[in-house]
A protein has these predicted regions:
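Expand to "…catalyze enediolate/carbanion chemistry for C-C bond making/breaking, isomerization
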Residues: 1-270
Length: 270
């Protein structure tokens, strides 16, 4: 269960340090790409911590301000991944991920060259010199950070989470291959953008069959890949979603999240 912010700097981070959420989504998909603000936000989390669970900061996953529509876009903008991870966040999420080559570049941009080799992805692209700030945010040495800052579950000891939004009809065509790239850690299906892509409406609480089929395909792809599926949750459907196997709930809020935790008998450390 996560909380989302669409912008914010030091003060906003400090206020969210004691969040109810399991992690924070810092959404730059439709917001300014401001690394000064993001670094301030992360420092605010440190200064407002530790968390209720005793961690230095909450986990933060940043939504990138690019769409993964093809390889050219990814090669032209992979530097954004390095900048974002260099701010000390713990993961990145890519919108409109259309194809396994896009996923591969995203994973490579999230790793260091000396990270453990793996079939299906090439050498990491993160460079030396950018690890100092992120290491301080994590509270570790530069060397320790470089060992920890690798993609899970490709590296079982990695603490970087890389996610995909399979959220249009073009991305759906290669959903299985995209989420199956080693280093991808979770995926979602993006009902809003998928509705626009198919030019259908979800008004009145009814989901058109084409959307239900899209959701089912992405969900099945994550199951095959052995990674979590993210879906919207509310008070009316949270138990159903949990029973179905949804692992990450969006839009839940504190009360709904607590209800889900109680349903799964999950005891929080506070």
């Amino acid at each position: 269960y996560y909380a989302q912010v669409n912008e914010g700097g030091y003060e906003e981070g400090k206020q969210l340090a004691q969040t109810w959420a399991d992690y924070i989504t810092y959404n730059m998909e439709h917001s300014p790409f401001d690394m000064h603000e993001l670094r301030g936000f992360m420092q605010g989390l440190v200064d407002g911590g530790p968390t209720k669970s005793g961690h230095r900061t909450p986990t933060v996953i940043a939504v990138l301000p690019i769409g993964g529509i093809n390889e050219q876009v990814m090669w032209a903008n992979y530097w954004m991944v390095e900048q974002v991870l260099g701010s000390g966040v713990h993961g990145v999420l890519l919108a409109h991920a259309r194809g396994p080559d896009v996923s591969r570049i995203l994973v490579e941009a999230s790793r260091y060259p000396h990270a453990p080799k793996a079939d299906g992805v090439g050498e990491g692209l993160r460079g030396n010199g950018g690890q100092g700030f992120s290491a301080r945010i994590w509270g570790v040495s530069n060397d320790e950070y470089q060992q920890l800052a690798d993609t899970w579950p490709l590296n079982p000891n990695g603490e970087i989470l890389v996610g995909l939004k399979i959220e249009d009809r073009h991305a759906l065509e290669t959903a299985e291959a995209s989420v199956g790239v080693p280093g991808i850690g979770f995926a979602e299906w993006g009902p809003g953008d998928m509705s626009m892509s198919y030019n259908v409406s979800r008004q009145g609480g009814q989901m058109p069959q084409v959307l239900a089929d899209a959701r089912a395909r992405v969900f099945a792809a994550t199951k095959k890949a052995g990674i979590p599926f993210l879906n919207q949750m509310n008070a009316q459907n949270i138990e159903q979603m949990i029973d179905e196997g949804v692992r990450i709930g969006s839009g839940a809020g504190a009360e709904v999240a607590d209800r889900g935790r109680q349903y799964t008998e999950r005891r929080m450390p506070w």
